[in-house]
A protein has these predicted regions:
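Short loop/turn elements at sensory-signaling interfaces that couple input to output
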Residues: 98-114
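PAS-associated C-terminal cap
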Residues: 1-10, 116-128
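Beta-strand residues that line the small-molecule/cofactor-binding core
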Residues: 83, 93-97, 110
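PAS-family sensory domains
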Residues: 73, 85-91
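Short hydrophobic secondary-structure edge segments in sensory/regulatory modules of signaling proteins
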Residues: 22-24
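PAS/Per-ARNT-Sim sensory domains
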Residues: 60-71
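Conserved hydrophobic beta-strand signature of PAS-family and PAS-like sensory domains
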Residues: 30-33
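PAS/PAS-like sensory domain cap-loop motif
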Residues: 39-50, 61-63
Length: 128
């Protein structure tokens, strides 16, 4: 199933109103193109700040794993999940689980990332 196109109003509303943090990124330019309120709040950035923050700044400690994972998602085109840490605006690291899905918009590859904060799960389940 193809992902809806960027600019599709129902897709935009679904992402914006999701309770889970959601991001649309350009994997080739290391840019966050869009983020919903939950995504901004999780990382502590305003919407405008986040759109000017490189993806590599959010994942500095695991950049090689992140790039390899993005390559896999782009190659397979299907969703996949990975556990990575995200660096917040204030510099703390947050354990997360990300589900990434590739789609095309205006002839360019994009990634939709749905992210779960795993820190609360860790407190309840130290084995995770």
């Amino acid at each position: 199933m193809d992902m809806p196109r960027e600019g599709d109003r129902s897709f935009e509303q679904l992402v914006e109103h999701s309770l889970e943090p959601a991001y649309v990124i350009d994997p080739l330019d290391d840019r966050i193109l869009e983020a919903n309120r939950a995504g901004c709040a999780m990382l502590g950035y305003t919407h405008e700040e986040l759109l000017t923050t490189p993806v590599s700044q959010i994942h500095p400690a695991e950049l090689p794993q992140m790039r390899e994972f993005l390559d896999q998602v782009l190659r397979d085109g299907q969703g996949s999940t990975i556990k990575l840490t995200c660096r917040t605006k204030i510099g703390t690291f947050l354990p997360t689980e990300m589900s990434l899905h590739a789609f095309e918009s205006d002839g360019r590859l994009r990634i939709l990332g749905l992210v779960q904060d795993r820190s609360e799960h860790r407190q309840r389940d130290p084995e995770d």
